[in-house]
Amino acid sequence: MPENSTKPKVLVADDERVIADTLAMILNQSGFQARAVYSGEKALELAPTFQPDMLISDVIMADLNGIDAAIRIRALLPSIKILLFSGQAATADLLEKAHAQGYDFEILAKPVHPQDLLSKLRGVN
């Protein structure tokens, strides 16, 4: 069995490439198998084949916001754990909309400290 098959898979989505790449690198060095994508649409496209255990996504992205991407990915992968992060105030309205639809996503504020992120991820394993 390949070594990566036992590592939790994490899909990281952020339209700021440096953030997505940095988070994926930190996660890969911390015992996860992480892939970075740069849009909500790409996350939705990759999720069925990558089969992540967890999604970490920015909320505010141009093509498909992180909450809508999370809802659509959860429909494909019902057991996926979802952690959202944002540095923008507009997030509250989007979260309220998701809560009204029965989704209870956890959110971290940007900038995300790597230790805070790892603690959250290890808590959902």
Show where each model-derived region lies.
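Non-catalytic signal-transmission and effector/linker regions of two-component phosphorelay proteins
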Residues: 1-9, 113-125
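The feature encodes the CheY-like receiver
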Residues: 20, 62
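Charged docking surfaces used in two-component/phosphorelay signaling
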Residues: 21-29
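Short hydrophobic/Thr-rich beta-strand motif most characteristic of the beta2 strand and flanking loop
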Residues: 31-38, 46, 108
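Acidic catalytic/metal-coordinating carboxylates
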Residues: 38-42, 65-68
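Short amphipathic alpha-helix used as the core "switch/output" element in two-component signaling
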Residues: 45, 67-78
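Active-site beta3 strand of CheY-like receiver
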Residues: 50-56
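Hydrophobic/aromatic residues positioned on beta-strands within the core alpha/beta folds
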Residues: 85-87
